Amino acid sequence: MPAAIHPISASGQLCFHESGMFRQDSLIMLKFIIKRICASIPTMLVLITVSFFLMRLAPGSPFTGERNLPPAVMANIEAKYHLNDPMYLQYFHYLKQLAQGDLGPSFKYKDFSVNELLAQSLPVSAELGFYAFLIAAIFGMFIGIIAALKQNSWLDYSLMSGAMTGIVVPSFVMAPVLVLVFAVRLQWLPAGGWNDGGLMNLILPVVTLSIGYVSSIARITRGAMIEVLNSPFIRTARAKGLPMSRIILRHALRPAMLPIVSFLGPAFVGIITGSIVIENVFGIPGVGQLFVNGALNRDYGMILGLTILVGIMTILFNAILDILYAIIDPKIRY
């Protein structure tokens, strides 16, 4: 007669097996994260290199608008900013600055570096972008789920028609319309300004910046959720009598998140670039105003620093999204 297996021994073996599987999954995930971070480094270097040489080779100079500058003064200015060095030396000098966290000088605001100007304006743009991104993700997913649950109903058609309108109308058209309605006619909200990020000053720019991405995320969520709700495992859950709220939250939401996560990277880039227009429309003292002033004054120190900063932020954000994608869908790790 075979010997009986002690229940404690069997339980211990099961725990050991599960612990080993957990360590293996953790190791695979760690390797994936390291691989993704390492893959971002060459992309950053290419971004820095291309941005630097495009700015340096562009026609004009930040000092060509200055009047009656003697050659000796111009030579001193160029020597101060290393502009009379060979191009490759300027490039390596800039890389050395970046390695120390220095984005270089501003040629327009001569008493300030790019870092000092960003320290004042970046928190404003970050607050605006954060709220717009948060609203886009939450409301977009909520509208998409409601539309999927009410598929082919009048509510579905109404929500998707509104979403299509939000997608096709650009923010620089939407902004004056919202100002005209809510600030001029109804006088519910201020037409512009920042006022230290007060709630009333935030509403119009945040809504204007986020409305297109709310619409896009809503349409993506609706399509993904409809596909998941028609899956066999969802039909099985319904047959068991599980409430719809539990089916959505515990079974359908995670697989439906995959295309949404894929879209968040382009949405992040769009919100950053869109904030340039929104900040100038509403008079918000953020990075957008620095970018426009730098472009108008040929301050390529400022433009280069902002381009590299936004590019690096985008690369890092996409790397984070890839890691999040791998957490949601473990097959990506292998």
Where do the language-model regions lie?
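Membrane-water interface segments at the C-terminal ends of transmembrane alpha-helices
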Residues: 51-57, 82, 94-96, 161-190, ...
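Hydrophobic alpha-helical transmembrane segments of membrane transport/permease proteins
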Residues: 44-92, 108, 112, 186-204
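Transmembrane alpha-helical core residues of multi-pass small-molecule transporters
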Residues: 39, 47, 135-136, 163-166, ...
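An internal, D/E-rich "acidic patch" concept
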Residues: 24-26, 84-141
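Helix-terminus/capping and membrane-interface signal
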Residues: 43-49, 128, 320
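Alpha-helical transmembrane segments of integral membrane proteins
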Residues: 28-31, 118-155, 171, 196-334
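Hydrophobic aliphatic residues
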Residues: 54-58, 66-70, 99, 107, ...
